Each structure stands twice: as structure tokens, then as C-alpha cells.
Amino acid sequence: MRARLALRVSGVSYEHREVALKAKPDAMLRVSPKGTVPVLCVSTGEVLDQSLDIMVWALEHNDPEGWLPTAPDAMAETQALIADHDEVFKLHLDRYKYPQRFGLLEGVHHRDAAAAWLFTLQERLQQQPYLSGPRWGFLDAGVAPFVRQYARTDRVWFDAQPWPKLAQWLVAFENSDAFAAVMHKHPLWVSPEA
């Protein structure tokens, strides 16, 4: 979702191909053998198959809302925060959402471990309106889809936690035009080879 958010805000033209991960098209596997989404094939022949790389690529082409940090060292700090999120929070999120996949009876321990990371976001949001600063930006788009997944796992529990700024931030994201646009359902792409 974060790659689609950046592609949308950048206005870069691209062809969206929705695929079923249970039946990955050969055309996709030829360009990105790892078989995960998203994958962006650029006209130069370059293949980007990491969502953050796609975000940077799209916003370097056009960043009308100023999502990319411009202050010295700000992008490095932003990428470090997202890396921490991806390595720590997402690990716990997956085990909280899908404990059976990891041989667990329940995911409460991982819910609580992920919550500790979310409290760092709450602290940041107490100082400024968005994670990126005075306006929505790269850091917000980089983590919001995963915070949404976490909240949706048990929304009643999430809403009862003492993180009002985080909850407001998430609701604003869920009610945004960008979110509505990227959540639009696309028909599955069928390869002409099929």
C-alpha cells in the first residue's frame, strides 16, 4: 500500500496489474523471481521490488506534496525509522495477526511488543501533527498501512489504548482521499500468454 500511496501522490503514470499471490503469473516471476509484491518495471528496464524503493523512485520523479524530507540528514533519519519499523514492528505485527503461522497459540505477547513501538509514534505525534513534521510525508506513508493492519486486528483493544494522537493520526489516514484511492479494488490481471 505504501508504494501505491507514493505512486498516487506523485502522479507518475503506470499500469497497475493486480495479481493473485496464490497464482503468481509467469510474467511477474520473470521480472522479479522472489515473487512478492509490489513490483515496478521501469521503462529503462530497471525492476524495483521493494516498496520503499518504489516510493523513492516515484517521489524523486514528482513530489507535489513535499513528502520527501529536504533537511540535511532528514532522509537518512526517516529511512532509519522506517527500517526499525520494518524490522521490529512488522515482525511483531505478523505474529500478532497470524499467530498460528508461527506455531503460536495466540499473539498477545507480540501485540504488546508492537505496542511499545507504537508508543514511540505517540510521543512523536505529541510534538508535531504528523510523523514527518508539520504535514503528512514519507514517514507517515511508510508506516501508516502497517499501523492500520495492527489496529484492525482488534480495533476495540486498539481504541482503548492511551495513544490519542496516534489514534487521531490513523483515523485521518483512513479517511483520506489517498487511502480511498489506493484501496480501490482492481480486477485481477490476466497475462496475454494465458
Locate each region found by the language model.
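Long, charge-rich low-complexity segments
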Residues: 185-194
